[in-house]
Amino acid sequence: MEFKDLIASLNIDAVLPEAIIICSSLFILIIDLIFQRRANAVLPYMAILGLILSMLSLLFQWNGKEVTAFLGSFQTDSLSIAFRLLIALSSMLCVLLSIEYLENSKKTLSEFLVIFLTATLGAMLLCGSNDILMIFLSLETLGLCSYILTGYMKKDIRSNEASIKYLLIGAASSSILLYGFSLLYGLSHGHIEIHEIAANLIKDQNGNSLASLVALALIIVGISFKIAAAPFHQWAPDVYEGAPTPVVAFLSVSSKAAGLMLATRIMTILFPYIINEWHNIFQILAILSMAIGNIIAISQTNIKRMLGYSSIAQAGFLLVGLLAGNINGYSSMLVYMLIYLFMNLGAFACVILFSLKTGSDQIRDYGGLYLKDPILALCLSICLLSLGGIPPFGGFFGKLYLFWAGWEAGSYLLVFVGLLTSVISIFYYIKIIKMMIIKESPEVSFAIKNYSQKRWSIKDITPIEVSILICVIGTTISGIFVNPIISIAQQTVIDSSWLMAI
């Protein structure tokens, strides 16, 4: 085969979105080396431009066709494109809300952006990975960058502690996942492409063997860590509290999106003959996540830690869609992931803005915020109400579609637990909203008494305020136009032939 034929067979254009992100990272490094601190003002917008171009290239690829690239190690299909688009969008919003945060902390901007874009690259590659080697390399790219970003505030003890905990638990989960992959590699006689592994398991009647069950258990442990599903959630509260808030916002969405896409691809292709076993395991994980996340969140006094436990519960809700195992199930998972992106990033953006003004992440310090900054209080309230599943915001319709898909699939216990824990979650979200709107002077926090009066204007709008407004609009609009969003999600699932073949 000639060199040009080999290059053509690789289908390099399938990874154009990821190539754009790589070029953006290199360009940021070069500009920073040449102009140094003088370029700090434009570097974030170069990253945003790269992410926008990456999203545009993904939209052009979203045509219902499936393309296999790099000799089978990467596959683009409608579902993977949708998840990659969600990751790129969340990264763009996180860059917007990190600009003021990093300027305030006096940390190097270029290094942060390059590591951040590399983490985004790992998450996007993970969504399209089609062999176990590519999966592991993508997972480690995301993981290693996440550990570095978590400890980016080197002089902050909490950031260092969170980074060490995340590194140790992450390394353990990666080794467990790798051992599961090694079992599949042996059972399939040395194949790494997941469709070939599945074919060999069927051929040798190893699909439901003891070794396959052990591999399944190990892989589920590794994936559950990435999506912060209980009882593999121990890292999440500490990391959410100690890590830089823009990093936490990124991990809360991108890590979940990549992990869910990986779980969908691996479980449906590799383990169709032991579907009852992995359904039962994930059902237990979903119930534990919804219960533990929402119950423990009630007692939290730090808002970032509270959102950490909320994120654990959200992982449980998303697993309801995976377990439904049909068009409505997978599409409801995708719809809720989109809505979760807006409402969760919106909440974190509000937390960052409040923290920059007051230096506090304590829930009690939000008392009376409405008196000094009514727009911020309103935006945070909308995001929290949506997270709690209160109509008419997107979170309500996203949960409704998830639970309907679960009920239709016969997951009655999951739906019951989901509804019950959703009611519990409303309590701690409403508690914060109630504190923000109090007007009695004794109950207004000290932080708010010293809070400078804020008047939002288009003329003086900051990047973090732009991020907040985008998220609030997205949260509201997704509730109004939920039917078209559901239709697009359903068509996305239908166009993914590997999913429909199950």
Swiss-Prot record:
Parts of the chain that traverse the membrane: 15-35, 42-62, 79-99, 108-128, 132-152, 167-187, 210-230, 253-275, 278-298, 307-327, 334-354, 375-395, 413-433, 468-488
EC number: 7.1.1.-
Subcellular location: Plastid, Chloroplast thylakoid membrane
GO cellular component: chloroplast thylakoid membrane
GO molecular function, one term: NADH dehydrogenase (ubiquinone) activity
An annotated GO BP: photosynthesis, light reaction
Main location: plastid
InterPro entries: NADH-Q_OxRdtase_suN/2, ND/Mrp_TM, Ndh2_N
Keywords: Chloroplast, Membrane, NAD, NADP, Plastid, Plastoquinone, Quinone, Thylakoid, Translocase, Transmembrane, Transmembrane helix, Transport
Topological category with respect to the lipid bilayer: Multi-pass membrane protein
Catalytic activity: a plastoquinone + NADH + (n+1) H(+)(in) = a plastoquinol + NAD(+) + n H(+)(out); a plastoquinone + NADPH + (n+1) H(+)(in) = a plastoquinol + NADP(+) + n H(+)(out)
Family: Belongs to the complex I subunit 2 family.
PANTHER family registered for this protein in UniProt: NADH DEHYDROGENASE
Subunit structure: NDH is composed of at least 16 different subunits, 5 of which are encoded in the nucleus.
Function: NDH shuttles electrons from NAD(P)H:plastoquinone, via FMN and iron-sulfur (Fe-S) centers, to quinones in the photosynthetic chain and possibly in a chloroplast respiratory chain. The immediate electron acceptor for the enzyme in this species is believed to be plastoquinone. Couples the redox reaction to proton translocation, and thus conserves the redox energy in a proton gradient.
Full protein name: NAD(P)H-quinone oxidoreductase subunit 2, chloroplastic
Species of the source: Mesostigma viride
Gene: ndhB
